[in-house]
């Protein structure tokens, strides 16, 4: 079971979505996430989210503290939101709903 989930919402600059996906694919190839799931999903209207499902808080922090972070690779292809931020992110520990059965 996952221990931590992270979601990073973003909007590629016009005409830059394919370049962003290529940069992400090259990053994932060259800097493997090991067995931690990371995928980009299409939210609609030109907005996407990078979802990371981590086994533990420690594995999440290891990704966050990488010297070469995926967000820095993606930033050049991303249109900032109205608040000036390139990404809108949230994360938290998994609530195991089976504990309530």
Range-by-range predicted roles:
Residues 13-15, 43, 55-57:
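Short coil/turn motifs at secondary-structure junctions
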Residues 4-6:
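Hydrophobic core residues within well-ordered beta-strands of beta-rich domains
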Residues 18-20, 60-62, 99:
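Short acidic, gly/pro-rich beta-turn/loop elements at beta-sheet edges
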Residues 9-22:
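Short, surface-exposed ligand-recognition loops at beta-strand->loop->(often short) alpha-helix junctions
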Residues 26-37, 53-89:
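An amphipathic, aromatic/His-enriched active-site/gating alpha helix that lines ligand/cofactor pockets
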Residues 1-2, 11, 36-49, 73-101:
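Glycine-rich beta-strand-turn "strand-cap" elements at beta-sheet edges
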């Amino acid at each position: 079971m996952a221990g931590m989930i992270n979601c990073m919402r973003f909007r590629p600059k016009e005409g830059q979505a394919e370049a962003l996906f290529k940069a992400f694919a090259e990053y994932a190839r060259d800097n493997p996430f090991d067995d931690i799931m990371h995928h980009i999903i299409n939210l609609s209207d030109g907005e996407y989210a990078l979802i990371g499902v981590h086994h533990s808080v420690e594995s999440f922090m290891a990704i966050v503290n990488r010297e070469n972070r995926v967000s820095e690779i993606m930033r050049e292809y991303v249109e900032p939101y109205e608040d000036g931020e390139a990404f809108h992110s949230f994360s938290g520990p998994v609530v195991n709903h089976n504990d309530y059965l």
